[in-house]
Amino acid sequence: MELDDLLVYYLWLTGIRGIGPVNQHTLLRVFKTPEAVYHASEAELLAAGLAKKRAKFVLESRDLDRARQVLEQCRKLGIFLMTNQDEIYSKKLRQNADLPVLMYGKGKPEQFSPDADLGIDFNQKWQPFGPEYMPTELDWWWKDEPLIDCPNRRIAVVGARRCTREDKEKCIARVKRCGEDNPSAIIISGGAKGIDGYAHTAAIKNGLRTIAFVGTGPDRCYPKEHIELFEQISEHGMILSEYPPGTSAYPSHFPRRNRLIAAWSDEMYVIGAGRNSGTLTTRQYFEKYHR
């Protein structure tokens, strides 16, 4: 099957109202491909574990026109599509059934390929960064595994939108240190004002790749003040979203964005987040995914 044809079926599957990531994962586990889901009978859908109401949603949605329109829109806007079978996805990510099976992005995904030539000697011994090196000046820090000899380490740096100058300096210093310890590190954040923006900017300044997970379509800049920053992120990394182009910012989208930051990260730093900060949901998701 041609790639565009495959993507059309993924767009169809992820666009079915009432069929979220958990059901999408279930269907793909049983039927293997979204095309097979498209052609499945009601009996087969029920046997796969779908409730009768959800099976009806699938059957009533059998029309690929909308999916083809979205694909064409993505091509015009320079948006790439990435399924959970892409090599950028780790095995650990594929095992989480509440994560999207399809994502939309802007930027340079080829820089995140395991085979990407970054001009870095991956045989060198980088600075070990275990518990004895825990940065005490940060509000919270945790890791999934030791940093030693770990190429393409994904490090989340998140925190308050309204942060102090001291928190800003902590953020910038931490990103710089991450790059010194591991020049192949990938800095992940949420593209928001405050710590998120400083983390992305510091990553770019220190020659690191960076990923911004957003709660809008990847073609939308939120906040608007970050238009220039988002352009830079697209040049030095990726902007990723589970939402199609044209999707506006809704409050409910940001906790969902936070779970992506947490799931994609091997290590996380939380800086300047208050007790009621939304950033703490990112920490909670990290603890969930990395138990």
Regions found by a protein language model. Name each.
Residues 1-5, 85-291:
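Glycine-biased, small-residue-rich flexible motifs in mid-sequence functional cores and linkers
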Residues 1-88, 127-134:
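Short, small/acidic-rich helices and loops at N termini and domain boundaries
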